């Protein structure tokens, strides 16, 4: 379920990028945007190297420690959303189950990281296979609770494209959208439970 977002941004002296216009063309890119397609080539080389490591490293190179900082940010954002909402009951919504699940996931992620390091040191094939299976599968826990309200196709409990934010994601979308978009505190309570459950499933997959 993991995905990758890779892109190149303009520098301060670069020409304007005619995004989604008739001037967004091969001619513009070849003459102005990336003359010689140097950036394109480097990005292709990087992706090739990344794919090589994902396929050939003894352990899939995922940095589970990144989840700790990101989940802390997601929780802080949710708390701010709830405290600033005019929806009756939002400021007092009980998210303790979610906080407990996040803490448990962070603990399991650290234990899985330690187990992966020990497996690498030992070179034990069975242990390496077990670790890789966990790293491959744990994201499935985040999609284990059914689709989001009114858009069943989106199933991830940690983030999803916003209903009206274009490419920008919404974190803890089931809870956040229940409050911000639907004004439904009962739905928010339901998705606190579902979100916590999805995180627990992911943590259970990671558990050594």
Cite the ranges covered by each PLM segment.
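Secretory-pathway/membrane protein signature
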Residues: 1-208
């Amino acid at each position: 379920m993991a995905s990758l977002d890779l892109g190149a941004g303009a520098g301060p002296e670069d020409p304007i990028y005619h995004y989604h216009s008739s001037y967004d063309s091969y001619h513009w890119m070849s003459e102005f945007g990336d003359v010689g397609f140097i950036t394109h080539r480097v990005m292709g080389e990087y992706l090739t190297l990344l794919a090589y490591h994902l396929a050939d490293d003894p352990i899939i190179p995922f940095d589970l420690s990144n989840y700790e900082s990101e989940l802390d940010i997601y929780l802080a954002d949710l708390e701010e959303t709830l405290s600033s909402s005019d929806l009756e009951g939002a400021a007092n919504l009980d998210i303790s189950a979610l906080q407990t699940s996040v803490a448990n996931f962070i603990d399991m992620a650290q234990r899985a990281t330690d187990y992966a390091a020990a497996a690498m040191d030992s070179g034990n094939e069975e242990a390496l296979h077990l670790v890789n299976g966990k790293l491959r599968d744990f994201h499935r826990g985040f999609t284990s609770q059914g689709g989001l309200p009114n858009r069943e196709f989106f199933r991830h409990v940690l983030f999803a494209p916003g209903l009206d934010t274009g490419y920008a994601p919404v974190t803890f979308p089931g809870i956040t959208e229940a409050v911000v978009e639907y004004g439904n505190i009962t739905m928010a309570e339901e998705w606190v439970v579902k979100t916590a459950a999805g995180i627990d499933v992911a943590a259970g997959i990671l558990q050594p």
